[in-house]
Amino acid sequence: MAPHPLDALTIQVSPETQQPFPGASDHEVLSSNSTPPSPTLIPRDCSEAEVGDCRGTSRKLRARRGGRNRPKSELALSKQRRSRRKKANDRERNRMHNLNSALDALRGVLPTFPDDAKLTKIETLRFAHNYIWALTQTLRIADHSFYGPEPPVPCGELGSPGGGSNGDWGSIYSPVSQAGNLSPTASLEEFPGLQVPSSPSYLLPGALVFSDFL
């Protein structure tokens, strides 16, 4: 049976006569025609084995890049740790230097026996504490001995404002007359009961030894 003549005919459709999808606007048709093919599309002639090789190669490149960046980050962290440690060591060194300078200045004012005695830090602090306490007690005892309670005056010597002359009474209790006798020598002559200690007994030479302050 001979083929139908219509089957042998081929219909050629030009791009101008090709109809778009039903319901699509001219703008959508133009955008679809002008859109370039996606780069992620795999060519048809590329086999699956080649695609696997390409993916494996990209993974290896990423791993190499990550391996190169990782040592850099670790190196930066180690440098940062060393910098912090160095700053902390510098602060501690300065603190100890200031402490040693202060202790040396304190040793310079303490009466050590012998003079070239080298005290440790704790010995210096203990000696300074005890030395300050001894000086405080010395001043307290000296003040108590010098400004002690006045001796009682006999009743027969007490006068009254009405008895005797007003000049004697005013000369005794007048602030002006007392202001002129403020020297320690005059006070001792008027009140023989007051005695000024020459020096405390525990400050005499040989009374205290250097070990008493430690």
From Swiss-Prot:
This is Neurogenin-3. Its main location: nucleus. Residues 83-135 form the bHLH domain. Residues 11-20 have a biased composition (Polar residues). Efficient DNA binding requires dimerization with another bHLH protein. Interacts with ATOH8. It is found in: Nucleus. It comes from Mus musculus (Mouse). It holds the Pfam family HLH. GO terms for molecular function: chromatin DNA binding; DNA-binding transcription activator activity, RNA polymerase II-specific; DNA-binding transcription factor activity; DNA-binding transcription repressor activity, RNA polymerase II-specific; protein dimerization activity; RNA polymerase II cis-regulatory region sequence-specific DNA binding.
